[in-house]
Amino acid sequence: MTHTPPNDQTIVDEYFKLRTNRRRSRLAWLFGMIATYGLTPDALEGFSWGPEASICIQGKRRPISPVHPQWAIIFRLKEEQPRNWQDCLQSLSEQLYCAMAYQKVGVNITDLLLSHQMRKRLYRSVKRPRKVLRPLAGVS
């Protein structure tokens, strides 16, 4: 049996379901970051905000842009970032994994990452048309 990754609407709905639950509202921020940037919680450690909703990760040359830039705005990721997020990232990650294990969150991290990778490939191929091979000059 094949498993299909969640569609965009499912991800957005799950984010707002988390956001409206007072006990899980901080998890919503982490969920939104994973969905928007396609990074695991561990990879988010030490990030900083870059231009135009991108984030800069230590050890990466270029900023990481969201596949859906509107998600950074809709989810208010910059504004809703926990004040001491560096200190509580490990705790937030554990809480998110537990919530997923007990099915309090309908979309797991693996599915979010898979969905992000698929959309990234799709949008990259749409942005860059395939190169057409041209015959070499003088060759018939």
Where are these regions (language model features)?
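Generic structural signal for individual residues within well-ordered alpha-helical segments
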Residues: 12-13, 45, 113
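Hydrophobic, Leu/Ile/Phe/Ala-enriched alpha-helical segments that form helix-helix packing faces
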Residues: 31-38, 78, 100-103, 130-133
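Basic, Lys/Arg- and aromatic-enriched nucleic-acid-binding interface segment
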Residues: 2-41
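Positively charged, low-complexity intrinsically disordered regions
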Residues: 4, 10, 20, 25, ...
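Short, charged phosphate-coordinating catalytic segments
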Residues: 33-54, 109-110
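Basic, alpha-helical nucleic-acid-contacting "clamp/cap" segments
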Residues: 54-100
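Short, basic (Lys/Arg/His-rich) helix/loop patches that form interaction surfaces
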Residues: 86, 93-140
